[in-house]
Amino acid sequence: MKQNKVKKMMQEGKPVVNGWLQIPSSFSAEVMSHQGWDSLTIDMQHGVIDYPNALQMLQSISTTDVTPLARVNWNEPGQIMKILDAGCYGVILSLIHI
């Protein structure tokens, strides 16, 4: 398992530059992962990216040192665990009501 670049940079107090992926394309994920981003977020909430698309995108990102993140549709443990198992190093949750 590769190092979580985002976690390390945050522990060191360094800024993290994150890219955003909303097109369901492993090719676009691969291109973006070679553009100097520290992390890339796969947006599964407001785009048309589903789990099979996200899995292919994660495979493309995994060939680089970019930290893969995902914003999931909702705060549902099964969905969160599934995307983490697929290779995400972090998850962005929205619509959290405490």
Task: Report residues per predicted region.
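Alpha-helix-loop-beta-strand connector modules within alpha/beta enzyme cores
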Residues: 51-72, 76-77, 81
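Structured helix-beta-strand junction loops
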Residues: 12-14, 64, 87
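Alpha/beta enzyme core
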Residues: 23-42, 46, 77-89
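N-terminal amphipathic alpha-helix/helix-capping segment at the start of soluble metabolic enzymes
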Residues: 1-18
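Short secondary-structure boundary/capping elements
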Residues: 1-2, 20-24, 49-53, 71-75
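Hydrophobic faces of well-ordered beta-strands that scaffold small-molecule active sites
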Residues: 17-19, 40-42, 68-70, 91-93
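Conserved small/polar residues in nucleotide/adenosyl-binding loops
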Residues: 96-98
